[in-house]
């Protein structure tokens, strides 16, 4: 089965190679999110990442859309994706990282760590 996959995610070369090796019968195109082209979106059967809604809505044969965010609401509006298109998202993928960040920020604020850092930086100048 041959599928055309557009990947709009920030992947390094190793991740690209791993993705291509996992399904060698698929054809891949990789674009940075800020460099997505309409012809690539129209070409794709599968889109991984948040290509612009205005481009996605013109692709009437897309079979799978993987949102890179937890809330793909803009893509779920009527007429954006074909009715038979499978939609998946990143719900829960960032939970641990966000929790760790929030805890670190809270501790930093409570202990005035940012004030200490700023004072240390002023002495180094």
Regions found by a protein language model. Give the residues of each.
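Phosphate-binding beta-alpha-beta segment of Rossmann-like dinucleotide-binding domains, i.e.
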Residues: 83-125
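An N-terminal-biased, well-structured beta-alpha scaffold segment characteristic
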Residues: 1-88
């Amino acid at each position: 089965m041959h599928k055309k996959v557009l990947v709009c995610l920030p992947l390094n070369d190793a991740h690209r190679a791993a993705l291509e090796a996992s399904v060698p019968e698929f054809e891949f195109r990789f674009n940075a999110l800020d460099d997505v082209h309409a012809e690539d979106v129209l070409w794709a059967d599968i889109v991984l990442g948040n290509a612009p809604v205005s481009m996605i809505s013109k692709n009437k044969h897309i079979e799978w859309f993987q949102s890179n965010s937890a809330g793909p609401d803009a893509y779920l509006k009527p007429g954006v994706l074909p009715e038979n298109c499978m939609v998946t998202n990143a719900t829960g993928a960032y939970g641990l990282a966000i929790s760790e960040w929030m805890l670190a920020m809270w501790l930093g604020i409570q202990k005035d760590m940012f004030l200490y850092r700023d004072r240390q930086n002023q002495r180094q100048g």
